[in-house]
Amino acid sequence: MIRRSPLVAVILFVAITHVVLALDDATRIDSSEIVPSEPTRRTRVSPHYISSGGSKRSLRQQAFRPVAYLKNKLNWFLSRFFGTPTDAFTQMNSPRSSRIANIFRKIYMHTAKDDEYFSRLRSV
């Protein structure tokens, strides 16, 4: 049973990665679908014109919010599995580490390099 636990972790990691990438592709919205074709519009309450730039930004943020949430969850899960990126780098250079685990450590280090939590840890 102990020998199968890394295999289960790898299978879970691959499944979570596929779900995150599938949601990333599914939530991409073209700007022509978000913003109406006319550049400005009038509101019923006030007679002044409102540019559509703000609505485009808010709709785009709403569209990408689930993917950002899942990426943060994935980084959290990987940080519990591998530790900090510095720990993962140290384990990767160890002569006793396996090649498959090193592949996932590289993926983890690549996804965690832009994360706020890890950038705060590096600056301390």
UniProtKB/Swiss-Prot annotation:
Induction: Expression is up-regulated at later stages of infection. Effector that acts as a broad suppressor of cell death to interrupt plant immunity. Inhibits cell death induced by cell death-inducing proteins, including the PAMP elicitor INF1 from P.infestans. Has a conserved RxLR motif that acts to carry the protein into the host cell cytoplasm. Lacks the 'so-called' EER motif, which is found closely behind the RxLR motif in most of RxLR effector family members, but the presence of an EER motif is not always essential for the translocation of every RxLR effector into host cells, or for inducing a hypersensitive response. This is Secreted RxLR effector protein 49. It comes from Plasmopara viticola (Downy mildew of grapevine). A motif (RxLR) lies at residues 57-60. Its main location: secreted. It is found in: Secreted; Host cytoplasm; Host nucleus. The keyword Cell wall biogenesis/degradation does not apply. The keyword Transport does not apply. GO terms for cellular component: extracellular region; host cell cytoplasm; host cell nucleus. It comes from the Eukaryota. Belongs to the RxLR effector family. Keywords: Host cytoplasm, Host nucleus, Secreted, Signal, Virulence.
